[in-house]
């Protein structure tokens, strides 16, 4: 039995299939951890969502910002839905849309396996959050998403403010939690997210730090695997394993085996895109701050959503 974490798929169905073949995925005994952003931009979002849904008995999914945006689109009127990009429109107009979206809405913001020693999130954690606190706050929002009032949450989750504070309540609290789990890259030592800074470390504004290097952060008792930040490339540092390697931008799709002492990395080439949009960052070559052993690499080396800022960005 093997446990594999896989980076952001973003609607790259063919590439996902190639990666599953490369790791010799066997649903009878293996488990997949998907780091979120299953859909959008890759052109095959419906096929990708159907694939992951078909593997639901053999996989774990955490929600990314693009997944939440898809859920928000699915909760709108049909007239509003027709304004979204063709990749997501195919999902909300599909015959099996209700089954797919209802299943997606039941997924987590954070997944923890303490026996294995890992936590999976999409983007980041507040500097002062222990893994136990992160689980608790994730469950708060998951209960809202899975409950009867989820449409109100999806309408109110957009916006960059407020920053996280334990005293927050209502939709302000839910929005702050969602932004940390699904949009975070850089933050201040007090945990204020900088949503406009998306490049590689060293390009950010003064006073900002990668969320996993911010001064004063708590020590965490689990290794963390995440996606979201394609500009980082493959990065392993401070107990964090960032594996969004920009498959949708012409980078690679990455799988990381979690159940071995020596981390094993497997990659396949991503979409053959020469230049990402100007609003996106081209992924760097894999970046590791600690030596990675046991590598097995095949290669070396938002969608139209509400006009307000929110989970679709990045």
Swiss-Prot record:
Specify residue ranges for compositional bias: Low complexity: 297-314
Checking Gene3D superfamilies in the record gives: 3.60.21.10
In its UniProt entry, what is this protein called?
Bis(5'-nucleosyl)-tetraphosphatase, symmetrical
CDD domains, sorted: MPP_ApaH (cd07422)
Upper lineage: Bacteria, Pseudomonadati, Pseudomonadota, Gammaproteobacteria, Lysobacterales
Per the similarity annotation, which family is this?
A: Belongs to the Ap4A hydrolase family.
Sorted alphabetically, which InterPro entries does this protein's record hold?
ApaH, Calcineurin-like_PHP_ApaH, Metallo-depent_PP-like, Ser/Thr-sp_prot-phosphatase
What Enzyme Commission number(s) apply to this enzyme? Answer: 3.6.1.41
**Care to name a GO molecular-function term for this sequence?**
bis(5'-nucleosyl)-tetraphosphatase (symmetrical) activity
Q: Per the record, what are the reactions this protein catalyses? A: P(1),P(4)-bis(5'-adenosyl) tetraphosphate + H2O = 2 ADP + 2 H(+)
Give the first-level EC class, as a single word: hydrolase
Alphabetized UniProt keyword annotations: Hydrolase
Coiled-coil residues are none
Q: Quick one: where's region Disordered? A: 267-314
The UniProt function text for this chain reads: Hydrolyzes diadenosine 5',5'''-P1,P4-tetraphosphate to yield ADP.
